[in-house]
Amino acid sequence: MASAENLYQEKMQELQKQMNKVMQTINNHSKVEAFLNSPFGQYLDQHPFVTLSLLVFISLSAVPVGIFLTLIAGTAIAVCLAVLIIEGIVISVGGIALLCILCGLAVMSLGVAAVLCVSYVAGSSVLNYIHAYRVTVGTRGRSGPISLNHETTTAEKSYRSS
């Protein structure tokens, strides 16, 4: 039993020496020295229970704070993607609405153009008929609103003979 106990004590002393070397390396670092020379560092050096409590608190709070920051980052990314998706949907709906309005205007413009063409052809035919009638009435010597005194053309002669 004594040999096992001696072996345990030797390993503990060796581990303690290694820990002391690590502590000296850490304490010799310039930033650690500056912190330990500050009033807060001196207070923590004089109150080990507060130091241990603060160390445990910081260690344990790292996980929830990390999860919270991950949640914030995930939410920000999700919001950005949602804004892009919503913006895409709004632009798509607006584009479809614009396309429908422009198609309706195109159909309406075709209808208006057709009505204007029919009106032009009908009006032109009526005016040509009225002009031809007045020419025939004016050449026969009848009193009418317009009395034309000119020589008759072959078209008028053929019209009169029929």
UniProtKB/Swiss-Prot annotation:
GO process terms (BP): lipid droplet formation
Recorded superkingdom: Eukaryota
Parts of the chain that traverse the membrane: 43-63, 66-86, 88-108, 110-130
Primary location class: endoplasmic reticulum
Cell compartment(s), UniProt: Endoplasmic reticulum membrane; Lipid droplet
GO CC, any one term: lipid droplet
Full protein name: Lipid droplet assembly factor 1-A
Species lineage: Eukaryota, Metazoa, Chordata, Craniata, Vertebrata
Protein's gene: ldaf1-a
